Amino acid sequence: MPYTPMMLQYFDIKNQYKDHLLFYRLGDFYEMFFDDAKTASRELDLTLTGRDCGMPERAPMCGVPFHSADSYIARLVAKGYKIAICEQTEDPALAKGLVKREVIRVITPGTVTESGMLNEGKNNYLCAVFFAGASAGLCFADISTAKVCATQITDGNITDKICSELAAFAPKEILSSADRMDYPEIYTFAKDRLGAFFDDTRNELFENGSFSELETRFGKEVFESHSLGAGSPAVLALDALIRYIRETQKVDLAYINSLEYYTNELYLGLDVNTRRSLELCETLRTKEKRGTLLWVLDRTKTAMGARLLRKWIEQPLVSVGAILNRQQAVSELVDSYIEKEELQNLLSSVGDMERLMTKIVYNTAGGKDMRALYQTISVLAPVKQQLKGMVSPELARLRDELDVLSDIGDYIDRAIVEDPPFSVREGGFIQRGFSPEIDELNAIQTDGKSWIASVEQSERELTGIKGLKIGYNRVFGYYIEVTNSYKDQVPDRYIRKQTLTGCERYITQELKDMEAKILGAKDKVCALEYEEFQKLREFIAGNVLRVQKAADILSKLDVYISLADVAGRNNYVCPEVDASDSILIKDGRHPVVEKFLKNEMFVPNDVNLNENERLMLITGPNMAGKSTYMRQTALIILMAQIGSFVPASSAKIGVVDKLFTRIGASDDLAAGQSTFMLEMTECAYILKNATSRSFIIYDEIGRGTSTYDGMSIARAIIEYTVSKKLYAKTMFATHYHELTELEDLCRGVVNYNIVAKKRGDELIFLRKIVRGAADESYGIEVAKLAGVPDEVVRRADKILANIDEHAPVDPKKNLMPKKEDAGAMTLGLETMLYEEVCEAIKKLDVNTLTPIEALGKLYEMKKSLEGAK
């Protein structure tokens, strides 16, 4: 038995999209069949049914309503599935035979444009990576905003550098020219850390590209200025990305016309671990925005501004001129309080112009989207006026370049009613007076409805049926309804159409003639209104460059205002940023931690790193604030280099080229690395990639191995860091107090400690950093504060006292203890165990012990002594 024509059509389309879930439009539903149906049923918890397909067995089938399909598609895309949307491409009422269908779009994790599937404050990037031996090209595109960036990596460990770039953009989908097994670290990072869909099966996208097409799209200048040719890795990645977008979206990509090519030298170097440990845009544990630097700095009013601020935080600048340009804009807004407040009020009513334009280009925009765009355009002229008196170069430039788009705004306002319906297919959204032809047809509908009302009244009078009424439905059109109690009074000219419980429905020839006029007018109105809407859409799409430029200006202005607002609210200061090699901070505070303190003030601290004081060797107890102090310094540097004010009473920041952190000791079990191996791997990366202009944080190096090994490695790292080979600005926190002697041995090493005081048995953290080494670590006191049982704390006190008794008089005289010292420590521990056994014997009441109990006590003591050997 052959398959039905519809099923044959389905197979023909499905064969073109074998690795996709095919959403096949049937009436008001998207249906899935066979394996697709089983997958969708499982993933979406849908009922699996069947459909006759011409074969003995029914085809497995499940479906979703087309009007609510987005939520189902979003769930599938989030799990990495690709969705092929197959629509009816002709009106079923006009079709001769089988309705024509074709795939109009493919939705993948990196090609989502639907607002309901996107985070408005975050870009949704698609990435392509082209591997070329020791170099690689990367390209990132957010097709919902038309943002495209590209870069090239040409030296060093490309695996680490690619992961750093991926961490900055966090793409949802990655196209790779190389097999995942060739670069397993990148694949694992993309999959496990980013949750990205990694596709290494589309090698053909990276072959036989068209460089001339790229030059036409983005302009020759961007390629010539960076010496990029047809064979450049970045160009091959870009070409693959554009081809993939065209293949999946099946629309004119004229709106993707601007390329930002960047080099690593433009931005502050931030590796993967540094981004995570500083919690720039998401927290380590909960992966949330709250508790991050972005959370503190984000007082943007627009989705576009929120996305741009995130990008700035992920990519701080290194050019002093570019930083000062931003800084001056923020500073002027801080001083212009009234104008800033008014601009914030204006921006509050701005829509997401970038994503609205994408909907217009994709022909998925409706009347409400057009009014949202109009609302945003109506704000442009007042914004330009508020910027009239601004003198900082950046704000003046934004003002002068801002196109208020009055022609587009006027067109939308004349054409679209203020509160349009959702659908553009059913009419009712074109303003009265915009089109004489539409107005005339609307008048026919209005007059027709008035005529219907008059007919209803006259028929009541003619027939004497008081309850007679005229109604309408899509099946029968207009009809006369009479209850059963009056049906004997119905005149012969009434034609019975439908019998219902309690009433009869009739039609008349006169009613049908008027119905044809009214409904004909309605159909024509719907068609003409849609035609006018398409003209409007095409006009706006033809001005996409102007709208994108205005959106870019508004987003930058929004970020500047946000940074100014945060500076004013949090008592930040404008840092002095220059090309010096010093970091001088007075009364610095942690921007995030201070926001969580409710009943106490954050204790500020100073930083003084310069040519002579290069490495701060920080000692002090756990929980005293060493990690907070080091992180706050890194965040202040980063804030300064995005153009922000900083939490301090004053700050002078010599621009840093790279920022590194080695914080935390959690095992990377998924990668099979122990705490110590992970620590050493990260240290090796830092030492290989840092320069004299870098800033490094080391927190407790060497804890994952034996004391002497750890101490030796920590010392060697310090010595190398302050050597002529590196001499990077560094903060090094340690519990190895023996290392403090390096202040006298190594140029640039300076001892600091976090102050803590004991008041009786109570330990008080003063959170203040001062010159000099800590006199004690207070480890046992910290254990007590942490809630360790008293019995354990007392035991620790005894062990410490015994160790101190057998320790060298001056441990600094020999940084690496001799073996006999270690033996003395072991002997001391054994002596303590014997003393404890003796003490336990003294406490026994032999007069009350039974023989069995005595044997039990003896067994316990024997086990204790054996455990000491």
Regions found by a protein language model. Give the residues of each.
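Charged catalytic and DNA/RNA-contacting regions of genome-maintenance
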Residues: 1-332, 345-348, 352-361, 365-457, ...
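Conserved phosphate-binding elements of NTP-dependent enzyme cores
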Residues: 1-2, 8-12, 19, 537, ...
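ATPase nucleotide-binding head domains, primarily ABC-like/P-loop NTPase cores
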Residues: 34-37, 231, 301-302, 309-312, ...
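Active-site phosphate-binding and catalytic loops of NTP-dependent enzymes
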Residues: 86, 109-118, 252, 390-394, ...
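Charged, surface-exposed helical/loop "interaction arms" that form contiguous linear patches used
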Residues: 362, 366, 376-379, 397, ...
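Extended, charged coiled-coil "arm/hinge" scaffolds of SMC/Rad50-like chromosome-maintenance ATPases
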Residues: 500, 504-538
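C-terminal tails and terminal domains of large nucleic-acid-associated
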Residues: 832-869
